[in-house]
Curated annotation (Swiss-Prot):
Residues 81-176 form the Toprim domain. A zinc finger (C4-type) spans 58-73. GO terms for biological process: DNA recombination; DNA repair. InterPro entries: DNA_Rcmb_RecR, Rcmb_RecR, Rcmb_RecR_Znf, TOPRIM_dom, TOPRIM_RecR. This is Recombination protein RecR. May play a role in DNA repair. It seems to be involved in an RecBC-independent recombinational process of DNA repair. It may act with RecF and RecO. GO terms for molecular function: DNA binding; zinc ion binding. Keywords: DNA damage, DNA recombination, DNA repair, Metal-binding, Zinc, Zinc-finger. NCBIfam families: recR. PANTHER family: RECOMBINATION PROTEIN RECR (PTHR30446:SF0). PROSITE patterns: TOPRIM (PS50880). It holds the Pfam family RecR_C. It comes from Jannaschia sp. (strain CCS1).
Length: 199
């Protein structure tokens, strides 16, 4: 029984390292898994083992898939002239949930950061330049987060790609759908005002 308790505590500790899960949430999740081991824990463990073996980074865009190329890069229905640049895979998946973009993606793998000593060579920026030439890209949409590092990265990429003559754009920033002005920070309101459009 002591070994089992140790294993359970180890599982809780591992779960607590996941983003969004603290010790209390991890403990609840583990208890649920144990109570529903046939319906949840075993299928989860089997699926995690398969994903651990098969998941890999797409050699083209940086998305996560199970082959050398992800499903998006293999989809011939995707617009080939547009590429949406995102910081990480979670951002790509968020864009896909919106179902508005029908082109291809490029995952940078982070942002430029002087504090964290991350330079252009540490990101997938050289691969982006190579894809521009190889794939005949005509428009690059910079969908980077509105953080200092995200905006610094966007400006760097824009400066790098400007000589190519490609159309460069970024996502609009401002008031979210359903948002109330009273609850927004000053920077968001300023960005929304600058990005206003005619009706």
């Amino acid at each position: 029984m002591a070994d089992t308790s140790k294993d359970i505590e180890e599982l809780i500790g591992i779960m607590a390292r996941l983003p969004g899960l603290g010790p209390r949430s991890a403990r609840r999740a583990v208890l649920t898994l144990i109570k529903k081991r046939g319906a949840l824990m075993r299928p989860l463990a089997e699926t995690m083992a398969r994903v651990a073996e098969s998941a890999r980074e797409c050699v083209n865009c940086g998305n996560i898939g199970t082959g050398d190329l992800c499903e998006i890069c293999m989809d011939v229905r995707r617009a080939t002239g547009e590429i949406c640049v995102v910081e990480d895979v979670a951002d790509l998946w968020a864009m896909e949930r919106g179902q508005a973009f029908k082109g291809r993606y490029h995952v940078l793998g982070g942002t430029l950061s002087a504090l964290d000593d991350v330079g252009p060579e540490d990101l997938r920026i050289p691969k982006l330049r190579a894809r521009m030439a190889d794939e005949g890209i005509t428009e690059v949409i910079l969908a980077l987060n509105a953080t200092v590092d995200g905006q610094t990265t966007a400006h760097y990429i824009a400066d790098e790609l400007a000589p190519t003559g490609v159309t460069l754009s970024s996502l609009a920033q401002g008031v979210p759908i359903g948002g109330e002005l009273d609850y927004l920070d000053d920077g968001t309101i300023s960005a929304a005002l600058r990005a206003r459009k005619s009706l």
